[in-house]
Amino acid sequence: MERAFLFAECDVDELNDISTSMRNAGHAQLADRLDKGRVGATNAGIATVNVVRDFPVALVGYGYTREHASPDRARLAPLPHDRQDTRLPLVAIETRTEGILVELAPLTLWQWCARNGWCPPPSVDTPEEVARAWLLDQTYAEPETDTAAAIRRVTHAYSHLLMHALAYHSSYSSNSVAEYLLERQASTLIYVAKYSSFNLGGLATLAEQHLQRWVDSATSSAWSCVHDPICLSERGGCHKCLAVTFGCERFNKGLDRGYLVGGGPQDIREGYLFTAQQVAP
């Protein structure tokens, strides 16, 4: 499991542990602010937020194209090399960076999918571990079900919301970060995509001290776009609300704000953010 690999190979700090460390060090106000942010994240349908301090990244280039950005249409030209040599040159950059791992709440996802008619609802007293097992059963099913597709697309859309909101609460813009999607676990890792130099600790500070503002800003922006109603009803998202210039694993394909707020090209009955508000403790 990709998520298990992150916890096994990287330095990952849970916000609960960070809050405890703050209190033990005499920083009660910072701990209170962090705990308030964790509650706000829960109310926004987020189960956990973790700080990843040494995420390994390797960028490898083996060709280029100036015609099509779509991988299925592009025909790559190899990097210059000796044509007598059967080997192709690769250009690679290896580094470690920092990121924030965000996981959507499995039980809230289950309730959201049920409200939209994609699956039967959970029982009233469904424990968290059962909801997590349900999530994996759905997302690893072959062929992909409507439920799995919805989980994949809402995870991707939520990831872009959070990337867009970074500019208001950190030293990074949406062009300075990238996403590593773990859609089968309804998770996304947003990491710094500046590989030569960056301010180490910038994202960690965001998660530890400004989590509430970051999440509130992201979720509030989902409900409207300057290009509405065309953006939501016809496209599902645009560069003003969801799309990013760099850092998207899917080249901004499949983004649909309707999965977050309802409506959109797929005419989603109820958005995930609305469900999260309704079922929040």
Language-model features and meaning:
Residues M1-P281:
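C-terminal accessory domains/tails appended to large, multi-domain proteins
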